[in-house]
C-alpha cells in the first residue's frame, strides 16, 4: 500500500515538474541567468516539504506535547533569523524580545481559537495554524524594525528635538513606532481586503481540494485572515516597545 502511494506521488510530482521546466526554459531563452537557481530552489522546496511531512507524522504521534515542541522550535528559528538580519547592537536582548513577541502572538491566537473551540485543540490543527501566525508575524516584525531603525537614523534631529522638549524616550519614539507599524501592517491589510475577490488563499484552496464544504472553508479562511491581521498589529507594536532603548541608540 505504501509503495503504491509513493509511486503515485512520484508520477504526480513528475508531471508537476513541468512547471519548473517551463520556467527554466524561458529563463534560458531570455538569458536571465537564473536557471540553476530555479532548479535549486524547486528541488530544495521538494526536499524540505517532504521532510516536514515525515516530521509532522512523527510529531503527531506525541500529541500536544509534540505540537508545543514543534511550535517552540519554529519560534526559536524565527527569532534567530530576524536577529541575524536586523542591525542592532544588543543581539541577545533582540533575540529575547523577538522570542517574547512570537510567544505572545502565538498564545493569544491559540487561546482565541481553542478556548471557545473554534478549532480543535489537536496537533493537526494547532501546528499549521500557529505556523501561519509565526510566518506572517516574521514579515511584520522584520518590516517594522527595518522601518523604525531607518527612520530614527534619517530623522535623528526630530527625535532629539522631542527629547530636548522634555519627552521621555517612549514618548519621543511613539510617532516613529506609529509610522513603522502602519507600514509593516499594510501588506497584510492589502491581502485581507483582496481575499476572495482577487485571489483564493492557500488554506481555503487546500480545504476545497480535500472536498470540504465551500462555506465552511470560507469560514475557516476568514478566521485565519483575522488571526494573522491581529497578530501582525500586536507583534509590530510589541517588538518596537520592547526594543525602544536599542532603537533610539541605533
Swiss-Prot record:
InterPro entries cross-referenced by the UniProt entry: UPF0014_fam
Keyword set, alphabetical order: Cell membrane, Membrane, Transmembrane, Transmembrane helix
Membrane topology summary: Multi-pass membrane protein
Subcellular location field: Cell membrane
GO cellular component: plasma membrane
Pfam families according to UniProt: UPF0014
Transmembrane spans: 6-26, 49-69, 95-115, 124-144, 195-215, 222-242
Main location: membrane
Signal peptide start and end residues: none
Protein family according to the UniProt entry: Belongs to the UPF0014 family.
Identification of the protein by name: UPF0014 membrane protein MJ0938
Amino acid at each position: 500500500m505504501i509503495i503504491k502511494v509513493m509511486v503515485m506521488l512520484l508520477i504526480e510530482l513528475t508531471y508537476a515538474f513541468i512547471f519548473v521546466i517551463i520556467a527554466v526554459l524561458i529563463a534560458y531563452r531570455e538569458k536571465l541567468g537564473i536557471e540553476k537557481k530555479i532548479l535549486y530552489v524547486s528541488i530544495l522546496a521538494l526536499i524540505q516539504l517532504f521532510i516536514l511531512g515525515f516530521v509532522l507524522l512523527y510529531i503527531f504521534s506525541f500529541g500536544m506535547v509534540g505540537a508545543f515542541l514543534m511550535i517552540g522550535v519554529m519560534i526559536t528559528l524565527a527569532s534567530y533569523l530576524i536577529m541575524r538580519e536586523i542591525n542592532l547592537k544588543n543581539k541577545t536582548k533582540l533575540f529575547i524580545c523577538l522570542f517574547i513577541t512570537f510567544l505572545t502572538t502565538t498564545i493569544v491566537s491559540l487561546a482565541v481559537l481553542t478556548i471557545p473551540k473554534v478549532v480543535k485543540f489537536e496537533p493537526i490543527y494547532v501546528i499549521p495554524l500557529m505556523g501561519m501566525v509565526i510566518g506572517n508575524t516574521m514579515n511584520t516584525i522584520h518590516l517594522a524594525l527595518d522601518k523604525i531603525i531607518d527612520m530614527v537614523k534619517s530623522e535623528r534631529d526630530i527625535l532629539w528635538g522631542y527629547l530636548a522638549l522634555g519627552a521621555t524616550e517612549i514618548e519621543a519614539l511613539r510617532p516613529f513606532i506609529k509610522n513603522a507599524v502602519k507600514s509593516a501592517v499594510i501588506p497584510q491589510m492589502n491581502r485581507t481586503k483582496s481575499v476572495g475577490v482577487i485571489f483564493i488563499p492557500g488554506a481555503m484552496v487546500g480545504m476545497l481540494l480535500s472536498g470540504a464544504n465551500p462555506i465552511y472553508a470560507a469560514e475557516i479562511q476568514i478566521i485565519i485572515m483575522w488571526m494573522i491581521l491581529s497578530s501582525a498589529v500586536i507583534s509590530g507594536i510589541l517588538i518596537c516597545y520592547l526594543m525602544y532603548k536599542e532603537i533610539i541608540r541605533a
